[in-house]
């Protein structure tokens, strides 16, 4: 993980630059000006990863400058991380003086939530034994966290291997299980704004929604309340299991979740070939009015873009505005951008999250 150049006095100017950049990318499509959703200036990041760096007999949390990956920047705190992470950092540093915990420890990962949950992953260049287990159990109790120990071919869990989050969308609180090692949105406050925007933009519908790349159900849960039924796809087994748990714990019963990639579902809808994982799913029985996509940085592949043309409405959340613009260019002859938004998930970096609603011309 690289260290962002943190300076709250520059935040507003950086956000304005991102807005101008997004507006410029979407200008060829006559898009409206983006709605802008800012971030807290500090303590916004709910997860963080640090290497450990030795200087003499002492070891420190370390990150690296994006311009020089070989030179560490030693840290005692991390202002962009959540207050919970900053509280845990010195207490964990004191604990790794215990040889059972500190011997050949080379990396530490923190995962926290707005709801107050926390999990620490400790990564080692050695096998973990019963002495480690005993020390980790004691530390977990002292810190009020779960701990996962990792070494090659080994993963030991003290407590739980997930955290629990609660996010309010349109007045309803949704509970999310977020597994260790799986993707979650790092900026919880901005994630909540994204969910509320998407819920508002989708609107109340009397037809069905197809969702690609659903992850742990982050968007699935609130969007399912706006439509008749949802067919959602995700390729990661860990994320699928978390999504199924999240659907059940929130009482959302109008979602069918299948473990397929977007490319595979496209083949299924085009009747290129059958998939065993779709056994019992009547694809032709759905009345899809909207498509929701939240693809990886590469955006939608050409076949998925062609699939998207079939939908009257496309709600697209993007972590890469360049591939978003490229995908819109493919769809521009059939769809127009009617709403767009900038979500500042990653302050003090050039990265941005954005969203658009496209409607058929």
UniProtKB/Swiss-Prot annotation:
It comes from the Bacteria. The keyword Nucleotidyltransferase does not apply. This is tRNA/tmRNA (uracil-C(5))-methyltransferase. CDD domains: AdoMet_MTases (cd02440). Its EC number is 2.1.1.-, 2.1.1.35. It holds the Pfam family tRNA_U5-meth_tr. GO terms for cellular component: cytosol. The gene is trmA. Dual-specificity methyltransferase that catalyzes the formation of 5-methyluridine at position 54 (m5U54) in all tRNAs, and that of position 341 (m5U341) in tmRNA (transfer-mRNA). It catalyses: uridine(54) in tRNA + S-adenosyl-L-methionine = 5-methyluridine(54) in tRNA + S-adenosyl-L-homocysteine + H(+); uridine(341) in tmRNA + S-adenosyl-L-methionine = 5-methyluridine(341) in tmRNA + S-adenosyl-L-homocysteine + H(+). GO terms for biological process: tRNA methylation. The active site is at residues 319, 353. S-adenosyl-L-methionine binds at residues 185, 213, 218, 234, 294. The keyword Oxidoreductase does not apply. One of its GO terms (molecular function) is tRNA binding. InterPro entries: MeTrfase_TrmA_AS, MeTrfase_TrmA_CS, SAM-dependent_MTases_sf, TrmA_MeTrfase, U5_MeTrfase_fam. It is an enzyme of class 2 (transferase).
């Amino acid at each position: 993980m690289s260290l962002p150049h943190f300076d709250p006095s520059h935040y507003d100017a950086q956000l304005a630059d991102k807005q101008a950049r997004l507006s410029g990318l979407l200008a060829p499509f006559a898009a409206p000006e983006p709605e802008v959703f800012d971030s807290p200036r500090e303590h916004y990041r709910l997860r963080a990863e640090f290497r450990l760096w030795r200087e003499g007999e002492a070891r420190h949390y370390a990150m690296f400058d994006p311009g020089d990956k070989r030179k560490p920047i030693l840290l005692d705190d991390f202002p962009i991380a959540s207050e919970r992470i900053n509280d845990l950092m010195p207490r964990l540093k004191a604990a790794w003086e215990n040889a059972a915990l500190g011997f050949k420890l080379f990396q530490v990962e923190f995962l926290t939530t707005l709801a107050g949950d926390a999990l620490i992953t400790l990564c080692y260049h050695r096998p973990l034994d019963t002495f480690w287990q005993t020390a980790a159990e004691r530390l977990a109790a002292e810190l009020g966290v779960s701990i996962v120990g990792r070494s090659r071919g080994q993963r030991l869990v003290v407590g739980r291997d997930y955290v629990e989050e609660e996010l309010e969308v349109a007045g309803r609180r949704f509970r999310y299980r977020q597994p260790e090692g799986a993707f979650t949105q790092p900026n919880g406050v901005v994630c909540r704004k994204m969910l509320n925007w998407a819920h508002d933009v989708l609107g109340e519908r009397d037809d069905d929604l197809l969702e690609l790349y659903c992850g742990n159900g982050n968007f699935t849960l609130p969007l399912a309340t706006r439509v008749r039924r949802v067919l959602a796809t995700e390729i990661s087994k860990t994320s699928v299991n978390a999504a199924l748990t999240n659907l059940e714990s929130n009482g959302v019963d109008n979602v069918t979740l299948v473990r397929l990639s977007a490319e595979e579902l496209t083949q299924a809808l085009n009747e290129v070939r059958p998939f065993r994982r779709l056994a019992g799913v009547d694809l032709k029985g759905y009345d899809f009015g909207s498509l929701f996509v939240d693809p990886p940085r590469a955006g939608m592949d050409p076949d998925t873009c062609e699939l998207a043309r079939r939908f009257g409405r496309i709600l697209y959340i993007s972590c890469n505005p360049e591939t978003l613009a490229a995908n819109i260019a493919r769809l521009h002859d059939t769809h127009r951008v009617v709403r767009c938004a900038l979500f500042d998930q990653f302050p003090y970096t050039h990265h941005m999250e954005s969203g658009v609603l496209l409607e058929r011309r």
